[in-house]
Regions:
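Sec/Tat signal peptide C-region and signal peptidase I cleavage site
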Residues: 17-23
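Early extracytoplasmic/lumenal segment of secretory-pathway proteins
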Residues: 24-90
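Extracytoplasmic ligand-binding site segments that recognize negatively charged/polar headgroups
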Residues: 33-40, 76-215
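A ligand-binding cleft/hinge motif common to bilobed small-molecule-binding domains
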Residues: 86-90, 215, 220-238
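Periplasmic-binding protein-like
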Residues: 110, 125-128, 187-196, 233-259, ...
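A bilobed periplasmic-binding-protein/Venus flytrap-type ligand-binding module shared by bacterial periplasmic
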Residues: 129-136, 171-176, 250-264, 269, ...
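Mature extracytoplasmic/periplasmic domains
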Residues: 256-318
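Conserved C-terminal helix/tail region of periplasmic/extracytoplasmic solute-binding proteins
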Residues: 314-343
Length: 343
C-alpha cells in the first residue's frame, strides 16, 4: 500500500506538472505573410524563449469576424491578436476584449498614452506618406499642400481609394495643424478632395498597386505606405518620399475576453512591447517599433532610425491617426460617404 501511495503521489505530481505546462502557452494571431515572419524572428520566438512558453500562431487578414464569433461562444480559442486599434476598441465596448491590466504590465504602462487604448497597446507603426518621382518632376512636393498645388507642382497624381488617411491629408493640405485634426471636419475634407479629384489619375486600392504606379512612372506623386515606397526606392533611384505630413498608424495587441490562457497572454503582451524586442523588428521589415523606448536601446543606428516612421524625429513630422475617432459614429458616417464621392 505504501508503494501504491507513492505511485499515486507521483502520478498526481506528474498530472499537476503537465497541466501547468499546458497552461504556459498562447495562441497568437496576426495578418500573415512577410510581416508575421518578421514578427516571429524579432519578437515571437524570443518572447517564447524568455517566458518559457509555447506560442501557437494563426493568421487572418481581418480578425474582427472571428473575434465576434469566438466571443459569442464565451470560449474563444485565441488569446492575443495583432489588429487595428479600432477592432480592439470595438471589441472592448462589446465585451469581447479584456481591458489592459496596467498593474501587471510595466512595459505597457511606460508607453505614451497616445500609443494605447484601454484595451490595447501599439505593436508596430507604419505611415501613409507622400511619394514622388524625382526624375519626372522639376521640383518635388514636400507636403500635402504641395500635392494639392497643381499649378506649382504639375504632374500626374494618385491617392488611396479609402477615406482613412485620405481625409486627413486633405485637411492638412488646407492648413489644419497636425495636432488639431480631430475630430475631423468631414465636410471641409470632402470639399478639399473635390478640388483635387479632377487631377487624380488613379485611386489605388492595394499596396502593390501603389508601388507599381510609382516604380513604373505611371504617376509622378502619390500617397503610399512607407514600407512600399521604401522597397521601391531600394531598386529605383528615381523614387523618393517624405515623412513630412505623413499619417502615422499602428496595429495593436489585445487579449480576448475569457482567453483560455489569460495570465500567460498578459505576460506575453508586456514582453512583446519591451524595448529590446521592439528594437529588433526593423531588422526584418520596414515597420517602426510600437514602443518609442526601442530607439534608446542602442540597437538601432541613427541611419536606420531615420528610415522608420515611428522614430522620434519622424513621428514629430506626422499626424497620429485617431482610430478612436474613426470607430465613432462620425467616423463610420465619413466612411459611408466615401463610396459616393469616388464614383
Amino acid at each position: 500500500m505504501k508503494n501504491a501511495g507513492s505511485v499515486l503521489s507521483l502520478l498526481c505530481v506528474a498530472i499537476t506538472c503537465a497541466t501547468s505546462a499546458m497552461a504556459e502557452q498562447i495562441t497568437f494571431v496576426s495578418q500573415g505573410g512577410v510581416y508575421q515572419e518578421a514578427q516571429t524572428k524579432a519578437i515571437l520566438d524570443p518572447a517564447a524563449k524568455l517566458l518559457g512558453i509555447t506560442i501557437k500562431q494563426d493568421s487572418v487578414p481581418d480578425a474582427w469576424p472571428m473575434v465576434k464569433a469566438q466571443g459569442e461562444t464565451g470560449k474563444p480559442v485565441w488569446d492575443v491578436i495583432d489588429t487595428p486599434p479600432s477592432n480592439c476598441l470595438r471589441g472592448g465596448r462589446e465585451g469581447l476584449i479584456e481591458p489592459l491590466d496596467l498593474a501587471s504590465m510595466p512595459n505597457v504602462k511606460g508607453m505614451p498614452e497616445a500609443y494605447r487604448t484601454p484595451y490595447s497597446v501599439a505593436y508596430e507603426f507604419y505611415s501613409s506618406v507622400l511619394g514622388y518621382n524625382t526624375k519626372s518632376l522639376k521640383k518635388v512636393p514636400q507636403s500635402w499642400a504641395d500635392f494639392w498645388n497643381v499649378k506649382d507642382f504639375p504632374g500626374s497624381r494618385a491617392l488611396r481609394n479609402d477615406p482613412m488617411g485620405t481625409l486627413e491629408a486633405a485637411l492638412l493640405s488646407d492648413g489644419v495643424p497636425r495636432d488639431k485634426l480631430y475630430p475631423l471636419d468631414v465636410d471641409r475634407a470632402y470639399k478639399r478632395l473635390a478640388q483635387i479629384k479632377p487631377d487624380i489619375a488613379v485611386w489605388w486600392s492595394s499596396g502593390g498597386q501603389s508601388a507599381q504606379l510609382l516604380n513604373d512612372g505611371e504617376v509622378d506623386m502619390l500617397m503610399i505606405w512607407n514600407g512600399r515606397v521604401g522597397a521601391v526606392k531600394k531598386d529605383n533611384a528615381d523614387v523618393g518620399f517624405t515623412y513630412n505630413d505623413g499619417i502615422l498608424q499602428n496595429t495593436q495587441l489585445c487579449i480576448l475576453k475569457n482567453a483560455p490562457n489569460h495570465a500567460t497572454a498578459v505576460k506575453f503582451v508586456d514582453t512583446a512591447v519591451s524595448p529590446d524586442l521592439q528594437a529588433d523588428l526593423p531588422k526584418y521589415i520596414d515597420y517602426g517599433p510600437g514602443n518609442p523606448a526601442a530607439f534608446a536601446t542602442g540597437k538601432l543606428s541613427a541611419e536606420r532610425a531615420m528610415e522608420l516612421p515611428s522614430s522620434p524625429e519622424n513621428a514629430a513630422k506626422q499626424a497620429l491617426m485617431s482610430e478612436e475617432w474613426w470607430s465613432s459614429a462620425e467616423g463610420i458616417a465619413a466612411k459611408d460617404r466615401w463610396l459616393k464621392f469616388v464614383q
